[in-house]
């Protein structure tokens, strides 16, 4: 019902939501550790991957606070209702990520938000500090990565997605403008 009103996930993937969205989001947990204290899910939309990570963190002996940021009031209203319904302790920010100026997070995560180049520009211009970024990228990941490398020095590794062999998870330890 909410998806019809707010376009939280693609209509093409509603029937396979568990595999396509939840399992896809959950795989990030393998790249988190006890040093990850504050996670910011940028462009959270339907709460993916942030809500899923928050739900499963205890099963992986992890403790972190989860922040979700989205500029859409409708999506934020949905996120707040999920937070309340599931009795989670999410910090939900209704603003453009550019407004998170000079905030400190240990880990930034994002799924289906912006191309890498634009993502890095936003993070650097906003002076958001981080130790690690985990980006979930689809089939055009190499085009995005190669484009971003023209403008940024990127210290990263990338891994195959467990839900789609054409997708990758980028674990980024540092990024700076060239």
Language-model features, listed with the residues they occupy:
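Class I SAM-dependent transferase core
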Residues: 1-36, 40, 74-77, 81-86
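Conserved S-adenosyl-L-methionine
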Residues: 41-45
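Conserved SAM-binding loop of SAM-dependent methyltransferases across substrates and taxa
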Residues: 46-62
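Conserved SAM-binding motif I beta-strand of class I
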Residues: 65-70
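Conserved SAM-binding strand-loop segment of SAM-dependent methyltransferases
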Residues: 86-97
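A short acidic, Gly/Pro-enriched loop at the edge of an enzyme's catalytic core
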Residues: 100-107
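Conserved beta-strand signature within the Rossmann-like core of class I S-adenosyl-L-methionine
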Residues: 130-141
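Active-site capping/gating segments
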Residues: 140-178
């Amino acid at each position: 019902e909410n998806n019809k009103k707010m376009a939280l996930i693609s209509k093409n993937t509603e029937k396979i939501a568990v595999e396509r969205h939840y399992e896809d989001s959950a795989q990030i947990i393998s790249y988190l550790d006890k040093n990850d204290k504050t996670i910011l899910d940028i462009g959270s939309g339907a709460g993916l991957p942030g809500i899923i990570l928050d739900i499963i963190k205890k099963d992986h002996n992890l403790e972190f606070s989860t922040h979700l940021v989205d500029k859409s009031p409708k999506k934020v209203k949905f996120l707040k209702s999920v937070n309340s319904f599931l009795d989670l302790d999410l910090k939900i920010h209704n603003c453009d990520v550019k407004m998170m100026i000079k905030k400190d997070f240990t880990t930034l995560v994002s799924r289906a938000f912006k191309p890498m180049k634009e993502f890095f520009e936003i993070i650097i211009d906003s002076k958001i500090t981080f130790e690690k970024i985990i980006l979930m990228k689809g089939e055009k990941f190499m085009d995005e990565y190669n484009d971003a490398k023209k403008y940024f020095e990127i210290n990263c590794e990338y891994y195959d997605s467990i839900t789609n062999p054409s997708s990758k998870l980028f674990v980024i330890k540092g990024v700076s403008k060239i």
